[in-house]
């Protein structure tokens, strides 16, 4: 299908350019000429462009490197969607600042130390039968040997676990085909205990290994007590992949430094880079994780280190669960083919890719045909007899990802700055493309799963150099999108990454992920359960227990309740905040001056903040997320008084009050305004009821939100009436103003519901009508004309029925408004609105499309 579309795009462009050479230069050509763009550039732009409201085909999750976060963007547009706070505090989301997210971050403390940064490398998606299912994402922290769990229901980090025996883990996260375990492999060997041993004890005491973190899918949590590790020799283990299909149950981990070199550049010895590369080969670790999972159940097969179960090398070897195969020196990536038979190893210092054959490996193991053992007693298989074959690719082969076609694979060449497409079954190179510059990881869509999709490939490059506007010596990273849908790879787009060095990407079809757009009211987003501090409207309160103060607060457009909080200096304050909105994307933020506090509350979410009121004074708090026209008024005061002080209060002058007559006029004015607003609201509710809004869940949620807001008006009306009956007109006006606030919130949700309902039930727009709507909006027409209402200009419903030869008349009027000003009808319109339509310099094509848009409006006139 994509090849067909590719061909059609070329044909369309060819026809376009052929036609236009005989005509005046089109705006399309003018733009290309002005910007120096080729037809190939224009085609690339078409392939990645998403009009407003159109979503991408794929999500891509990228390890954020030094940022300690995970970046999410869409493909093919490459538009960034979110930075997920993982190992590093992230203030916009309140991650690491409110109590609930801080608990997650503090799970990552190591030996009593707060660790507030991470080096995120390899995100991995949860799998079902080797296929991505879109439920969870896992990512490792190389610097501090940690794994995080991200719940894709909310796109938030829900757990961090610290490796109990390793100090650095690069080979994570890697997932078994049904997400039974998350594998995390040691990088730099150390003693597995936390004790000191000199470097001279390297061979005897230092060890590597792999940790199997047991994952409970129902709980969405790693179960530390059910997890275990396998001890490896102190070779420096690198990346891992899990078997699938015929190789299900097995895992494969690369390593370097089979020389067991320990450095010493400061003593005049060769550096690590030289000492670790002397030998011609290193070792691929091959181990049966299903057998290991059975072995660990018997405590005789384990030793306990730092409270964690570890299977020693000798136990794994004795039970036929661990083997080594030589591989070309200093390998990096290891990747199992979608069917599980082929294992592709990347050699950084070798121009060849090595393809191992799982069937051959199994036969050698079954026949116990080994060429020897290493220093630690692990059987070694013959490299040549294990190989399916080798292919010469180029310099600096680092990583691989699989394409949709049988046998297709794409590899990154760091030194050559290239992506190479080749066939691992036929052992031949198919295509190469240059990138910019020095590619590291590589990700074709779902290219590491059992069901690769092809379509696009992302090159995660290490250098950007001259690709973007200069921003000083520290450059952004460059992720490049490549079209792999045809026989030849095509570079489409460069994307600057401004925060951290991205490592591995994990991609998945957007149709597989279904995030929530709101929480069940009172949810703790980090646990997915109802928060102990859940507070509904009307339940707001302040409770004191000794020097502990508990505040139960709500946030809704456009106020925080309570708005005045008075505590004593030295009080321990706990504040529970609930966003009681239901409308999608109505997020509220919360901060208090001087307290180093910030939290983000999505609709329905409850969170907790704790602080000690240890300084006297008055501290404003407010909503940090712009949420309504009266956002700035969404604030309050924390007042901290010293209980040991005697304050002398100065009576402030009262503001000059309005006269009784002026108050009465003001009261009647706002009553009239509220009655008019209420008529609009009732018309909206009537429209929604008549059009059976309940059939559309998103519309229904908006209407529920609108009715919730409207239901609060009755109480305010009672307060207003009571105040008025007591001749307290000032308070009556205040309560009527509160009624207006609730009406505005009601109308906001109801109008959004109406617009969404119209888009759901209206007749589909033609392509011309869609373009006409864009031209109408971008040409400034919507500044004066509101469809279905008289605004600064007339309502345009039925505009094509107001004149003879209406389409021609409207076209002429848009083209040259002044030419119609003399007509009697237009003279009256100009006099009524006191405006003349300016010439918007619309093209003939835009005018034609706008008329098609007007036709669509008339077809659906009863909806406006």
Roles of regions detected by a PLM:
Residues 70, 620-626, 772, 778-788, ...:
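The canonical Cys-X-X-Cys-His
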Residues 645-649, 653-665, 755-777, 864:
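Electrostatic cytochrome c docking/interface patches
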């Amino acid at each position: 299908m994509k090849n067909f579309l590719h061909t059609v795009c070329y044909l369309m462009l060819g026809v376009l350019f052929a036609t236009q050479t005989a005509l005046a230069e089109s705006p399309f050509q003018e733009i290309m000429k002005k910007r120096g763009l080729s037809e190939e550039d224009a085609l690339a732009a078409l392939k990645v462009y998403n009009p407003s409201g159109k979503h991408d085909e794929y999500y891509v999750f990228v390890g954020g490197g030094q940022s300690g976060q995970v970046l999410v963007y869409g493909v093919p547009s490459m538009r960034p969607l979110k930075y997920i706070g993982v190992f590093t505090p992230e203030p916009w989301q309140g991650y690491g600042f409110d109590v609930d997210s801080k608990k997650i971050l503090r799970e990552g403390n190591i030996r009593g130390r707060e660790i507030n940064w991470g080096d995120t490398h390899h995100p991995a998606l949860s799998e079902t039968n080797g296929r991505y299912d879109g439920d969870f994402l896992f990512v490792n922290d190389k610097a501090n040997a940690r794994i995080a769990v991200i719940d894709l229901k909310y796109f938030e980090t829900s757990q961090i676990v610290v490796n109990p025996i390793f100090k650095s883990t690069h080979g994570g996260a890697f997932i078994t085909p049904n997400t039974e375990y998350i594998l995390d492999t040691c990088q730099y060997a150390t003693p597995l205990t936390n004790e000191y041993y000199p470097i001279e004890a390297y061979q005897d005491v230092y060890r590597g290994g792999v940790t199997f973190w047991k994952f409970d899918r129902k709980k969405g949590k790693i179960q530390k007590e059910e997890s275990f590790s396998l001890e490896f020799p102190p070779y420096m283990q690198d990346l891992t992949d899990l078997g699938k299909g015929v190789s299900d149950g097995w895992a494969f981990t690369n390593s370097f430094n089979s020389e067991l070199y320990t450095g010493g550049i400061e003593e005049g010895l060769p550096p690590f880079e030289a000492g670790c590369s002397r030998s011609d080969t290193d070792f691929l670790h091959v181990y049966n994780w299903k057998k290991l999972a059975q072995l660990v159940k018997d405590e005789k097969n384990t030793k306990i280190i730092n409270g964690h179960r570890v299977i020693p090398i000798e136990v794994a070897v004795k039970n036929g669960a661990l083997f080594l195969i030589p591989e070309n020196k200093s390998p990096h990536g290891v990747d199992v083919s979608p069917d599980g038979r082929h294992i592709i190893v990347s050699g950084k210092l070798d121009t060849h890719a090595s393809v191992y054959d799982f069937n051959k490996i199994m036969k050698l193991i079954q026949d116990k045909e080994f060429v020897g053992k290493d220093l630690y007693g692990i059987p070694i298989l013959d490299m040549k007899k294990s190989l399916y074959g080798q292919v010469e690719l180029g310099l600096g082969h680092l990583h691989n990802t699989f394409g949709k076609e049988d046998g297709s694979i794409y590899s990154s060449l760091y030194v050559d700055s290239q992506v190479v497409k080749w066939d691992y079954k036929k052992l031949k190179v198919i295509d190469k493309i240059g990138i910019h510059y020095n590619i590291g990881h590589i990700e074709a869509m779902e290219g590491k799963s059992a069901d690769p999709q092809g379509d696009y490939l992302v090159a995660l490059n290490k250098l950007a150099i001259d690709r973007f506007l200069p921003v000083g010596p520290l450059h952004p990273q460059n992720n490049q999108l490549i079209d792999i849908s045809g026989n030849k790879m095509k570079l489409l787009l460069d994307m600057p990454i401004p925060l951290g060095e991205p490592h591995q990407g994990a991609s998945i079809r957007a149709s597989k992920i279904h995030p929530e757009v709101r929480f069940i009211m009172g949810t703790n987003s980090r646990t997915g359960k109802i928060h102990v501090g859940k507070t509904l409207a009307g339940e707001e309160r302040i409770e004191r227990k000794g020097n502990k103060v508990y505040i139960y607060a709500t946030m809704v457009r456009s106020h925080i309740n309570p708005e005045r909080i008075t505590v004593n200096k030295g009080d321990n304050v706990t504040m529970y905040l609930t966003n009681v909105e239901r409308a999608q994307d109505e997020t509220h933020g919360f901060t208090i001056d001087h307290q180093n506090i910030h939290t983000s509350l999505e609709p329905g979410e409850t969170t907790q903040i704790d602080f000690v009121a240890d300084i006297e004074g008055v501290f404003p708090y407010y909503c940090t997320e712009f949420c309504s026209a009266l956002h700035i008024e969404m604030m309050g005061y924390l007042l901290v008084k010293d209980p040991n002080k005697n304050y002398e209060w100065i009576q402030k002058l009262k503001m000059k009050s309005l006269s009784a007559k002026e108050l009465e006029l003001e009261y009647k004015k706002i009553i009239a305004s509220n009655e008019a607003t209420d008529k609009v609201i009732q018309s909206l509710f009537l429209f929604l009821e008549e059009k059976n809004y309940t059939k559309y869940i998103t519309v229904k949620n908006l209407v529920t939100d609108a009715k919730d807001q409207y239901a609060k008006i009755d109480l305010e009306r009672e307060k207003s009436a009571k105040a008025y009956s007591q001749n307290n007109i000032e308070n009556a006006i205040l309560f009527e103003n509160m009624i207006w606030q609730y009406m505005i919130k009601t109308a906001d949700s109801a109008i959004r519901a109406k617009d969404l309902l119209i888009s759901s039930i209206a007749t589909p727009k033609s392509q011309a009508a869609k373009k006409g709507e864009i031209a109408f909006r971008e040409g400034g027409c919507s500044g004066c004309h509101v469809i279905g209402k008289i605004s600064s200009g007339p309502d345009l419903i039925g505009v094509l029925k107001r004149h003879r030869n209406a389409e021609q008349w409207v076209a002429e009027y848009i083209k040259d408004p002044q030419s119609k000003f003399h007509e009697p009808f237009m003279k009256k319109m100009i006099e009524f609105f006191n405006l003349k339509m300016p010439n918007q310099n619309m093209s003939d094509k835009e005018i034609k499309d706008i008329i098609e848009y007007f036709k669509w409006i008339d077809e659906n006139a009863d909806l406006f």
